[in-house]
Curated annotation (Swiss-Prot):
Annotated source species: Sus scrofa
PANTHER family with a match to the protein in the record: AGAP007712-PA, RHO GUANINE NUCLEOTIDE EXCHANGE FACTOR 2
Name used for this protein in its record: Rho guanine nucleotide exchange factor 2
GO molecular function, one term: zinc ion binding
GO cellular component: bicellular tight junction; cytoplasm; cytoplasmic vesicle; cytoskeleton; Golgi apparatus; microtubule; protein-containing complex; ruffle membrane
The protein's role, per its UniProt record: Activates Rho-GTPases by promoting the exchange of GDP for GTP. May be involved in epithelial barrier permeability, cell motility and polarization, dendritic spine morphology, antigen presentation, leukemic cell differentiation, cell cycle regulation, innate immune response, and cancer. Binds Rac-GTPases, but does not seem to promote nucleotide exchange activity toward Rac-GTPases. May stimulate instead the cortical activity of Rac. Inactive toward CDC42, TC10, or Ras-GTPases.
Main location per the UniProt record: cytoplasm
Assembly description: Found in a complex composed at least of ARHGEF2, NOD2 and RIPK2. Interacts with RIPK2; the interaction mediates tyrosine phosphorylation of RIPK2 by Src kinase CSK. Interacts with RIPK1 and RIPK3. Interacts with YWHAZ/14-3-3 zeta; when phosphorylated at Ser-860. Interacts with the kinases PAK4, AURKA and MAPK1. Interacts with RHOA and RAC1. Interacts with NOD1. Interacts (via the N- terminal zinc finger) with CAPN6 (via domain II). Interacts with DYNLT1.
Keywords: Acetylation, Cell cycle, Cell division, Cell junction, Coiled coil, Cytoplasm, Cytoplasmic vesicle, Cytoskeleton, Developmental protein, Differentiation, Golgi apparatus, Guanine-nucleotide releasing factor, Immunity, Innate immunity, Metal-binding, Microtubule, Mitosis, Neurogenesis, Phosphoprotein, Proto-oncogene, Tight junction, Zinc, Zinc-finger
Length: 961
């Protein structure tokens, strides 16, 4: 019992088990508590889970009691210590144990502490100890050390109280000292109230409205800077220095406030400077700002826009966590609660608490589009200003859209990391044909959407699952013991978005079907509402449309594949850095040449421009290697023509010095002659002199032409840029080939020729295709070609198999036909023998009892039965011919009958040995011997009998008498 009781003590808490309702929340994890795992500490009145007791902080009331007891014990011990000599023993005043002003200043930093408990003299531990030496009792030393520790703790509490003593207004005034004039100038509510009434009446109504909006922009920017200053200088500094909070906790409360403060302070300074420039002479209040678009474009474009996007994205994405952390600190830490109350007690900061400041900073970026739109609405007459404001409005909207997108991605990334941390490390699910899918695969993808749904199983039951819509898959997770696992159901838990079809269930408002192609499965899931179902269908369809292919994004990636992917990404990053460096180098070279021309007196030469899209490998305007090389060759030829003259080979000019030639009658200057008629040579080459401004050339219209030096410098800059662009293109092409086609040099050689070759359409002015896009298309075409070749080979094999099978069937058919013909002939001969042996007189054909019914087995035979049923046998002649037919048949076949009896045996045995099913059995009797033919072949052979009869009609026949 003692051990069980001791186990209930955790961090000073005395926990007891209680019964609670289902709505009771845990103080530690903020989740609902069931009746079996509820614990309560009666000392501090905290209710938590049984599993959360180790994570709870120390009991506050127990800690306070211990501190009070220790302080009381220390005071008692100090009172019993004599620090003076025996003759002048007296009790030391209580003020002597308090810290000095210098010690408090070291804790308070630069603030001026004026606590009523401050001391005039300092005291140290050795001063308290007095005449004690090393032989003093150890217990007394311990008491003194504990007393100094308690003094430090009390000094920290007093430093917090000193913050309100010196006044939040004083601190606020110190923070806003840099913008003191701005605060006074923008104290009025609007521009109409800030300027003089006489000055106001001089302007139109549209100008008043425009200036009111500009005034509001500057005023709100000033208030925003004030909010940031309060967050940085007042709250954050106080938490770090006064409360001694961890820097990570304070950074979680106020992320990126320094960067935001710098951005908006710089922008506010520019606005105030523009306002100062717009002041009317002799008046510190009256101003009209006519141009503001240029400042807005500078603020919301370029590096400033990139910095704003980065800082606001991070701040807004951590907005929810910051508020949650603030509420937790305010609920748990009494010192933090006291600090916030004292700081916000003043009238200046009453509406600027921590939560209000965080919300104001988050909403600030959304105010710019509204203000700029209103300024543009009331701006008339200045077209350039309207264009600048329109451009600035577009830039602000683009910035806001990018920030929203970044915030959404960061929030989804944080949500994905949270899910990953809660997943069971051993959780895996098999993917058909791919292998196990573990939780590491989640971090490779981006989370697009997630939510709790009901999965209807094959048995008709509903399972609570968490569905994650990611880059290329749908993942189903199930919560078990506060951990996420893959549900063990009858269908895979990972569904590929490749060719995924999503359909709503017609008779249900919340249900939808997910039809997967690989493997072919159909999932039925149900959302919480109809709106949730519509949202899921919309985001799934959008993700299916942009789903990457399996070649670019495999479903499951091994460690080697991940390593190769990282290397490829690093190579691409290095290529981009190389391109940026080359572009910067070419720009510096162009500026250098421009500066040299200006020093030489050619100030009219514009800055050389570089080809647009020269270093942009992602754009469609990026030239390929062969085009860059051809352009560079043309620039070299043009430079050669400019230096040595057209029509002169560069090889000759490098070997033989050019001679000065006089100007011809047509006014053309020959090689070696300068523009002013002077020829200068140096080491066999012609030196190009600088043309004077008075002797500059002009065209027929009188326009100023470029001097030869300017033309040469322009071509030199172009050549420099083209060569570096060629270097960048070659580097990117090499990386592309090594990354995409590592299987052999032949394929890389083909790709090189394809990428460097410009078609006729490109030369005609069509936009060239990017190398990476061309390589992707080439790989796709090669893959399609391989698939078509394989399909063609498969079709050929199938055709050969079908032809072989058809040949074998045809051979079997011929064999069966031959066997059947042989059997039919034998059966016919047997029937003739039976007819000759069994009946001396034939039966009348018209006798109904002589007709044998059709064998049922013949009904299954093919067209032979139809011919048999439609055949009408020839009718024998009346009277005498009717009796002569069987006699003729009998006389004709008697020799054959005798021979058959001797060699083949009885006809019955011959019929039994036959394999033909129509030859019958012994049970059919004599009627089977007169059965008609069952096939057309039998009919054609039976026609010979009447012919033989007719051929013997001329012979004399003996009468019966």
């Amino acid at each position: 019992m003692k051990e069980a009781k001791d186990a209930r003590y955790t961090n000073g808490h005395l926990f007891t088990t209680i019964s609670v309702s289902g709505m009771t929340m845990c103080y530690a994890c903020n989740k609902s508590i069931t009746a079996k795992e509820a614990l309560i500490c009666p000392t501090c009145n905290v209710t938590i889970h049984n599993r959360c007791k180790d994570t709870l902080a120390n009991c506050t009331k127990v800690k306070q009691k211990q501190q009070k007891a220790a302080l009381l014990k220390n005071n008692t011990a100090l009172q019993s210590v004599s620090l003076r000599s025996k003759t002048t023993t007296r009790e030391r005043p209580s003020s002597a144990i308090y810290p000095s002003d210098s010690f408090r200043q070291s804790l308070l930093g630069s603030r001026r502490g004026r606590s009523p408990l401050s001391l005039a003299k300092s005291v140290s531990t050795t001063n308290i100890a007095g005449h004690f030496n090393d032989e003093s009792p150890l217990g007394l030393r311990r008491i003194l050390s504990q007393s100094t520790d308690s003094l430090n703790m009390r000094n920290r509490t007093l430093s917090v109280e000193s913050l309100i003593d010196e006044g939040a207004e004083v601190i606020y005034n110190e923070l806003m000292s840099d913008f003191e004039m701005g605060e006074k100038d923008f104290a009025a509510d609007s521009w109409s109230l800030a300027v003089d009434s006489s000055f106001l009446q001089q302007h139109k109504k549209e100008v008043m409205k425009q200036q009111d909006v500009i005034y509001e922009l500057i005023q709100t920017e000033l208030h925003h800077v004030r909010t940031l200053k309060i967050m940085t200088r007042l709250f954050r500094t106080g938490m770090l220095e006064e409360l001694q909070l961890e820097p990570g906790v304070v950074q979680g409360l106020f992320p990126c406030v320094d960067e935001l403060s710098d951005i908006h302070t710089r922008f506010l300074s520019q606005l105030l400077e523009r306002r100062r420039q717009a002041l009317c002479p002799g008046s510190p209040r009256n101003f009209v700002i006519h141009r503001l678009g240029d400042l807005l474009i500078t603020q919301f474009s370029g590096p400033s826009a990139d910095q704003m996007r980065k800082t606001y994205s991070e701040f807004c994405s951590r907005h929810t966590k910051a508020l949650k952390l603030y509420k937790e600190l305010y609920a748990r830490d009494k010192r933090f609660q006291q600090f916030i109350r004292k700081v916000t007690r003043s009238a200046v900061l009453k509406r600027h608490g921590v939560q209000e400041c965080i919300l104001l900073v988050t909403q600030r970026i959304t105010k710019y589009p509204v203000l700029i739109s209103r300024i543009l609405q009331h701006t008339h007459g200045i077209e350039e200003e309207r264009q600048d404001l329109t451009t600035a409005l577009g830039l602000v909207k683009e910035l806001l859209s990018n920030v929203d997108q970044d915030v959404h991605e960061l929030e989804k990334g944080a949500r994905l990391q949270e899910i990953y941390n809660r997943m069971d490390p051993r959780a895996q699910t098999p993917v058909p044909g791919k292998g196990p899918f573990g939780r590491e695969e989640l971090l490779r993808r981006k989370l697009i959407h997630d939510g709790c749904l009901l999965w209807k199983t094959a048995a008709g039951r509903f399972k609570d699952v968490l569905m994650l819509l990611m880059t290329d898959v749908l993942v189903f997770l199930q919560e078990k013991d506060q951990k996420y696992i893959f549900p063990a159901l009858d269908k895979p838990s990972v569904v590929s978005l490749q060719n995924l079809i999503v359909r709503d269930i017609a008779n249900q408002e919340k249900g939808m079907f997910l039809i997967s192609a690989a493997p072919p499965e159909m999932y039925e899931v149900h959302t919480a509402s109809r709106d949730d179902r519509s949202t899921w269908i919309r985001v799934i369809q959008q993700s299916v449309r942009v789903c990457p292919s399996r070649e670019d994004f495999p479903l499951i990636e091994t460690e080697d594949e991940a390593y190769l992917r990282r290397i490829k990404m690093e190579l691409q990053q290095k290529d981009r850095a190389l391109v940026e460096l080359l572009q910067e180098k070419v720009g510096l070279f162009a500026e250098m040449t421009h500066f040299q021309v200006e020093e030489d007196g050619g100030g009219g030469m514009p800055l050389p421009t570089l080809p647009r899209g020269l270093f942009r490998s992602e754009s469609l305007e990026s030239p390929r290697g062969e085009r860059l090389l051809q352009d560079a060759i043309r620039e070299v030829e043009g430079l050669k023509d400019l230096l040595v003259g057209p029509g002169v080979e560069l090889l000759l000019t490098s070997r033989e010095p050019a001679l000065p030639v006089e100007t011809d009658s047509g006014g053309n200057t020959s090689p070696g002659v300068t523009a002013n008629g002077e020829a200068r040579t140096f080491n066999g080459s012609i030196e190009l002199c600088r043309a004077d401004s008075d002797s500059s050339q002009k065209d027929r219209n009188g326009n100023q032409l470029r001097s030869p030096q300017e033309e040469a410098l322009q071509r030199l800059v172009n050549l420099y840029g083209l060569l570096h662009g060629l270097q960048a293109a070659v580097a990117q092409q090499d990386t592309l080939m090594e990354a995409r086609f590592p299987e052999g040099p032949e394929r890389r050689e083909k790709l090189t020729r394809a990428n460097s070759r410009d078609g006729e359409a490109g030369r005609a002015g069509a936009a060239p295709v990017a190398p990476e896009k061309q390589a992707t298309e080439l790989a796709l075409l090669q893959r399609q070609h391989a698939l078509l070749q394989e399909e063609l080979r498969r079709c050929r094999r199938l055709g050969e198999e079908r032809a072989t099978e058809a040949g074998s069937l045809e051979a079997r058919l011929r064999e069966s036909e031959q066997a059947r013909a042989l059997l039919e002939r034998e059966v016919e001969e047997a029937r003739r023998q039976l007819a000759a042996l069994g009946h001396t007189e034939p039966l009348p054909a018209e006798a109904p009892w002589a007709r044998r019914p059709l064998d049922p087995r013949r009904r299954s035979l093919p067209a032979g039965d139809a011919l048999y049923l439609s055949f009408t046998p020839p009718q024998p002649s009346r009277g005498h011919d009717r009796l002569d037919l069987p006699v003729t048949i009998r006389s004709v076949h008697r020799p054959f009958e005798d021979r058959e009896r001797q060699e083949l045996g009885s006809p019955d045995e011959r019929l039994q040995d036959s394999s033909d099913p129509d030859t019958g059995s012994e049970e059919e009797g004599s009627s089977s011997r007169l059965s008609p033919p069952h096939s057309p072949r039998d009919f054609t052979r039976m026609q010979d009998i009447p012919e033989e009869t007719e051929s013997r009609d001329g012979e004399p026949v003996a009468s019966e008498s």
